[in-house]
Amino acid sequence: MINNYIDITIRLLENILDNEADYVKEAGAKVAESIENDGVIHLFGCGHSHILTEEVFYRAGGLAAIHPILHEPLMLHEGAAASSVLERKNDYAKTFMAEEDIRSGDVMIVLSTSGRNPVPIDVAEIAREKGAFVIVITSLQYSASQKSRHTSGKRLSDTGDIVIDNGAVKGDAVLKSANFDIAFAPTSTVTGAVILQSIFAEAIEKMVNDNFTPPVFISGNVENADEHNQALVDKYNERIPLLGMNL
């Protein structure tokens, strides 16, 4: 099974490289432009998609200007099944997005593999209303196979200024076994992480080429990194309170 899973995942990544690279580069350029102009990069996802927003937050080798919107009822630790119910509620996003400090010139990255549920769609639209440039990471194949749950009939892919396809199959899981008819081994976390890290790598390279110093964290487990990292925390803590220390 390991060979099958890795082979399929490699093919998905190769497809992203072949078909989505231009969108990734365009997204990276928008991220660079935002950061160069004191903007912040916001990320949102429900359920397992939220894991990707934390993957790139306060990350060694990652950008400091990253703000994950972590609304706990839509994560998993307060009740996994409950989070799925809430994700399907139209207008629920208004209960937490109103207070988010999203400004003109910021970038909002919204992740949802199925792309059918109301909360990610509403998050994208509210962020745009606040002036953000919206990047969507979704599966176009999966999304097209399912009816939208949003009252407008929209899918997440309808809300993005840039839409990047993670290539996930319907249901996300790619493996099957004899005498067991439920698919297993999802791919969207792997492909999503690669897409996000590629966007930010493109952004960092663009900033360097623009003679702008990218705000990149150094691993805290490397000697003499603390002073460098603390300066970045101090720079962004007002806009991204999650970076601060609450000891």
From Swiss-Prot:
Molecular function via GO: carbohydrate derivative binding
GO terms under biological process: carbohydrate derivative metabolic process
Pfam families for the chain: SIS_2
Matching CDD domains: SIS_RpiR
Domain named SIS: residues: 31-214
SUPFAM superfamilies recorded: SIS domain
UniProt superkingdom: Bacteria
Family to which this protein belongs: Belongs to the UPF0309 family.
HAMAP family the UniProt entry points to: UPF0309
Protein name: UPF0309 protein lin2794
